[in-house]
Amino acid sequence: NLWQFGMMIQHTTRENPLFKYFSYGCYCGWGGGGPLDATDRCCFVHDCCYG
């Protein structure tokens, strides 16, 4: 779920995902378009699975 995804990001990057990634790229937060980089692709995959 979204909470677990956020905790995984926080554990891996040591960053607060809400502030760091909410409006990042095309897929982190309210997304659309094509992934910009590896981080944005991770959000894209999450959207495909849980969106």
Curated annotation (Swiss-Prot):
Cofactor: Ca(2+)
Residue numbers binding Ca(2+): Y27, G29, G31, D47
Matches recorded under SMART domains: PA2c
Enzyme Commission number(s) from the entry: 3.1.1.4
GO cellular component: extracellular region
Catalytic site: H46
Keywords on record: Calcium, Disulfide bond, Hemostasis impairing toxin, Hydrolase, Lipid degradation, Lipid metabolism, Metal-binding, Secreted, Toxin
Cellular localization per UniProt: Secreted
GO biological process: arachidonate secretion; lipid catabolic process; phospholipid metabolic process
Recorded GO MF terms: calcium ion binding; calcium-dependent phospholipase A2 activity; phospholipid binding; toxin activity
One Pfam family in the UniProt entry: Phospholip_A2_1
First-listed, main subcellular location of the protein, grouped into a coarse class: secreted
Reactions this protein catalyses: a 1,2-diacyl-sn-glycero-3-phosphocholine + H2O = a 1-acyl-sn-glycero-3-phosphocholine + a fatty acid + H(+)
Entry comment describing in which tissues the protein is expressed: Expressed by the venom gland.
UniProt keyword Glycosyltransferase present: no
Disulfide bonds: C28-C43
Manner of cofactor binding, per the entry note: Binds 1 Ca(2+) ion.
Function recorded in the entry: Snake venom phospholipase A2 (PLA2) that impairs hemostasis. PLA2 catalyzes the calcium-dependent hydrolysis of the 2-acyl groups in 3-sn-phosphoglycerides.
Protein family per UniProt: Belongs to the phospholipase A2 family. Group II subfamily. D49 sub-subfamily.
Protein name in the entry: Basic phospholipase A2 Bfon11
